[in-house]
Each structure stands twice: as C-alpha cells, then as structure tokens.
C-alpha cells in the first residue's frame, strides 16, 4: 500500500464506538433521529473524537448507526501512533470526559454521563485496553468496509450553511440546533487554518473558532487575575510548553510586573508553542473549566452590560 506524506496510508484500521447515556431520560438513538438535534450531536462527536486523537486528519467517522438506546459510531483510523493515542485517551477516560462535555449542551443537558464500549469486529477491546499492542492489531485487522456515509457529508454542508456568512474574528450564531463542521482532510493535505465553518458550542450557540490574537491576550490578562495559574493548568494538559515547571517559572520571572503580565505571558507562551492550534475554543474551554464564564463571554464579544449573553 502506498504511503502518504506522513506515512499514514501504511496503517489503516476500523473500530466501532458504542455510546449509551447513563441518564434515564436521555436516549441517544432517539435524540440523533431528531432533526433539531442531529447536527449538534454530530458536531459534538467530531469535536470530542478529534480532541482524543489530537489530530483530525487521521480519525474519521464513517457512519453513525442508531441501535436503541445506543449510538454506534464506525471509525476509520489512519496511522498507528495516532490510533494508539486514541486508545490511550479511551483507556484513561479522557475520551469519555470530552464526549460528556461536548454532548451535554447538544442534548440540552447541564451534565451527561455516558457508558462507552469499543469493538473491533467480534472483539470487545475494553477487555484488552492494558494491552495496547493487541488492541492495535485487532483494529488493523478490521479494514474499513465502506466509504464515508453520504448523510455525514450532508450534515457538514448544513453546518457550513449556518456559518459560512461569519467572516468576523469571533461572535456567536444563535440557532435552534447548535453544532459545527470539523472538516477531515486527507493525510497528504496540510492541516488548514481554522475556517469560517469550523465552530464550537458555547451555551447552546455556535461560535466561530479562530487562532488567538493579541486582543485576546490583552482581554484575558486584564480580567483573569489570580486564576491565570488555574487556566494554565487546564491548558497544559495538551500543551507541553506549559507543563511543570513552566507556570512556576512564569510566576517567578514576572512577579514584579504583576498579574497582568503573568497572565499575558502565559497566553504568549501558549500561542508561540501551539501556533495555529492555539485557538479560541481551547481557551474558552479552559476558562469554563475554571468557572470563568464571564471572561469567556468577553472574549466572544457576547457580554451585555447586564452580564447576559448577546
């Protein structure tokens, strides 16, 4: 098999991810068949899965099946190392956490608990998660048996229609069903900068994702105060440049300059290390995790004088 630019074409496998809500009143299969919720659920799945694999160009949803009360997501993996990264996220619970966080607003829930199961063919991989090599071999043995489902392309077209007229640097789009496209490029394509139809959910609204700017740094540094360290700890989970002892070093180096400069330099280091991956979505999620919703609203330009959302 011919290798792609990054060698991903040499390793292709498939698996099924089963999702079931542990909340009695939430039936995922029913929710996904609701046209008002389908787009938001699809976006939530795409976002969480892309986070877990740390790359959207090697993990692709081929089809979403409804099997009451479950959703069954057929996945295509391209690249052994990144498939291993997905397995690690699944094993350590990071995927479950991401799915619960992303799907809760899509289902109009404040919180959501999910039960997951991972299968490759007849093998239930949950029984072998500590043996990553075995899991990888099972996934590799299951070659994708289909092309990407046409319905998923239609969902992404719908998402683009919702967001294609958003050319500003930020802002939210209020829609009945919130969700967005997370495009999956081929392994040989360079990962593009966030486009207008790459969005994320914030309090049930679609927000256009984009790289962070100098203005974002200033807004963050002006308002975050003592919590800049806590936000840094949230960001450091997926940013090696912020891992210990980086935060302590920043605090010491800029102690005389005050909290504003410490917070400003935190985002500066994040943006330098991550480049175009230092996005508004990642910062907003870190702020929400640390109960700094009002600051997130300021960054999104959604804050009203009375503190509400635009």
Curated annotation (Swiss-Prot):
Query: How does it associate, per the subunit comment?
Result: Stimulation of TNF-alpha receptor TNFRSF1A leads to the formation of two distinct signaling complexes. Plasma membrane-bound complex I is composed of TNFRSF1A, TRADD, RIPK1, TRAF2 and BIRC2/c-IAP1 or BIRC3 which interacts with CHUCK/IKK-alpha, IKBKB/IKK-beta and IKBKG/IKK-gamma promoting cell survival. Subsequently, TRADD, RIPK1 and TRAF2 dissociate from TNFRSF1A and form cytoplasmic complex II with FADD and caspase CASP8 promoting cell apoptosis. Within complex I, interacts with TNFRSF1A/TNFR1, TRAF2 and kinase RIPK1.
User: What does the entry give for GO biological process?
Assistant: canonical NF-kappaB signal transduction; extrinsic apoptotic signaling pathway; extrinsic apoptotic signaling pathway via death domain receptors; positive regulation of canonical NF-kappaB signal transduction; positive regulation of cell migration; positive regulation of execution phase of apoptosis; positive regulation of hair follicle development; positive regulation of inflammatory response
Residue ranges constituting the Death domain according to the UniProt record: 213-303
Q: What is this protein called?
A: Tumor necrosis factor receptor type 1-associated DEATH domain protein
Q: Which residues are glycosylated?
A: 243
Species name for this entry? Mus musculus (Mouse)
Q: Where's the motif Nuclear localization signal?
A: 229-242
- Give Gene Ontology CC terms: cytoplasm; cytoskeleton; nucleus; plasma membrane; tumor necrosis factor receptor superfamily complex
Q: What is the lineage of its organism?
A: Eukaryota, Metazoa, Chordata, Craniata, Vertebrata
The record's function comment reads: Adapter molecule for TNFRSF1A/TNFR1 that specifically associates with the cytoplasmic domain of activated TNFRSF1A/TNFR1 mediating its interaction with FADD. Overexpression of TRADD leads to two major TNF-induced responses, apoptosis and activation of NF-kappa-B. The nuclear form acts as a tumor suppressor by preventing ubiquitination and degradation of isoform p19ARF/ARF of CDKN2A by TRIP12: acts by interacting with TRIP12, leading to disrupt interaction between TRIP12 and isoform p19ARF/ARF of CDKN2A.
Compartment(s) of residence: Nucleus; Cytoplasm; Cytoplasm, Cytoskeleton
């Amino acid at each position: 098999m011919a290798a792609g630019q990054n060698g991903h074409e040499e390793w292709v496998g498939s698996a099924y991810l089963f999702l079931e809500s542990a909340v009695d009143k939430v039936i995922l299969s029913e929710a996904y068949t609701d046209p008002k919720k389908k787009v938001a659920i699809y976006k939530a799945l795409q976002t969480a899965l892309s986070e877990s694999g740390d790359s959207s160009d090697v993990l692709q949803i081929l089809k979403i099946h409804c099997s009451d009360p479950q959703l069954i997501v057929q996945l295509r993996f391209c690249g052994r190392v990144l498939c291993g990264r997905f397995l690690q996220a699944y094993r350590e619970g990071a995927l479950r956490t991401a799915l619960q966080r992303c799907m809760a607003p899509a289902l109009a829930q404040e919180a959501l608990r999910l039960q997951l199961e991972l299968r490759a063919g007849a093998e239930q991989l949950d029984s072998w998660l500590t043996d990553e090599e075995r899991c990888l071999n099972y996934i590799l043995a299951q070659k994708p048996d289909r092309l990407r489902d046409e319905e998923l392309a239609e969902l992404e077209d719908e998402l683009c229609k919702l967001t294609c007229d958003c050319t500003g640097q930020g802002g939210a789009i209020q829609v009945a069903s919130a969700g967005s496209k997370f495009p999956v490029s081929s392994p040989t394509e360079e990962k593009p900068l966030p486009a207008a139809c790459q969005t994320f959910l914030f309090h049930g609204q679609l927000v256009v994702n984009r790289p962070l700017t100098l203005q974002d740094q200033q807004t963050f540094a002006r308002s975050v105060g003592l919590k800049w360290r806590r936000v840094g700890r949230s960001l450091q989970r997926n940013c090696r440049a912020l891992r210990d002892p980086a935060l302590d070093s920043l605090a010491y180096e800029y102690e005389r300059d005050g909290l504003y400069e410490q917070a400003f330099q935190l985002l500066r280091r994040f943006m330098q290390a991550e480049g175009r991956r230092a996005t508004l979505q990642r910062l907003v999620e870190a702020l929400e995790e640390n109960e700094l919703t009002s600051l997130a609203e300021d960054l999104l330009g959604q804050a009203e004088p009375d503190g509400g959302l635009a």
